[in-house]
Amino acid sequence: MKNSMIIILLFLAVNVVNGQEKDTRLDGLEEEIEQLIKTYNAIGLSVIVVENDKTVYSQGFGYRNLEKKLPVTENTSFHIASMTKAFTASLLGILEGEGRVSLTQKPSFYIPKFQFYNNEMDNLITIESLLSHKSGLGSLDGSLVLFGENNRLKSLAKLKYLKPNGKINDSWLYSNVGYTIVGTVAEQVTSKSWDENIEEKIFRPLNMNNSFTSLEKMKSSNNYSLGYGVSAGKVQNVSFEKYYDYSPAGAIKSSSKDIGNWMRTWLNDGSFNGKNVLPKDYVYSATSIQNIRDGGDSKGTFLFGDGFGWRMESRNGHYKVHHGGNTSGFSSIATLYPFSNLGIAILCNQQNSTLPYLILDLITNRMLELPRNAISDYPLIISDIYTDDNKIKGLNEEKKPTNELTNFCGKYFHKGYGTLEIVKKDNSLFVVYPNFTYRLEHLYYNTFKMKLDEGDAQILNPDFFELNFHQNNEGKIGSIKINLQYEPVEFIKETDK
């Protein structure tokens, strides 16, 4: 009888312990995710949830290669685009911890002969300014993408000819070129490439074995995802983006398992598996608001700002640290709730997709035990990729160009960007940049807009860019103004310089 009672008590104790350990917060999650994947016509994604320094959920969905039906796993590498910025910023934080860099120092202290557009910028912009998007540089992506170099120093030498887009240290203007600059600082200080530094100081210590800084290295692995997009309801394969000299702003490819290690490190004051990787003081600074920004009208969300490679806000009473990534064929998001010791990341192989954010909301509400939304409550927003409609329109007969099309042809130059060329082919004009070629569609008089050439990566929306050709005093085409910045940038025709 005594032995029987002991067995019964042990049985009850085990069941009580099991009842305490069983976590029902994510019950039914996979069914909801699969429903959203179907609704969004998505191909594949990977989800990871870490809590209290442990992985509590890790799952791949769909395919990394649709044609070959290769499944997504937790080790599948996706392009994470601007999520890269937190890695580059951390590299500077590590170097500061080593006493080799000061984030309050000017970049010219480390980069020989480096200059901004004017003395005010040279004197006031610091590495911190660049990391928190308050330098005033803003978007100079046309320079990075259309005129990209394979030499960062050569590319940065152009900045002294480019006007700022905002107030110095008193604005929030997202800037990829800012991260290109700080990545170059790291290279100058260490005499190693940005790629080598990221591998040595972050990937290896965090056991990020399926993370890469280049397409070539990623393709040498046996588990990476292709990129996809949707056009008119149909799925299309999308070319990978090549980052040229702006890799520090967005070139990393990683897996959800690796990002799980990355998030655990941030939630553990910079330590991973008992070893300090990121300085604790830097972790605090990077996840604190360094620059206030307008977050728009978002219900239940307040206090918007940027740290170093991360964005911050207060969501339903929880401090949220996050950053997304969007590039040709991929959309991703990583989010930390530091005071709940919770990290969530979703990597998706769909272009310009809100799907990762919907899944993030589903998981956040479950893990933090907030009111949940039904799947049907989420708006269906599917953004089509940019495609060439193959319908070449003729000239606007009511508002014809002032010159024959052949007179528009030639090379045009700007010191801060470089040289572009206008060529004529089959009665159409094309603009030829160093890295891309776009067909020009006539709008009115001497104004044209760019149209995608089939097969180009989904980096810039060409429809956004207009080319306004201007006549000189002799009535000849002498320059082009292109809306590459807030103020149009003028390229001078070389024969008329």
Where are these regions (language model features)?
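Short, conserved catalytic-motif segment at the N-terminal edge
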Residues: 22-78, 100-102, 109, 116-117, ...
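Short, solvent-exposed loop/turn and secondary-structure capping segments
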Residues: 58-61, 140-146, 213-217, 356-357
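Second-shell loop/turn segments in exported
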Residues: 21, 77-79, 115-118, 143-146, ...
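Catalytic loop of the DD-peptidase/beta-lactamase superfamily, centered on the K-T-G motif
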Residues: 20-59, 187-200, 204, 239-497
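Active-site helix/loop module of the DD-peptidase/beta-lactamase fold
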Residues: 79-83, 95-138, 161-163, 184, ...
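Bacterial Sec-dependent N-terminal signal peptides
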Residues: 1-24
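Catalytic nucleophile serine of serine hydrolases
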Residues: 82-83, 173-176
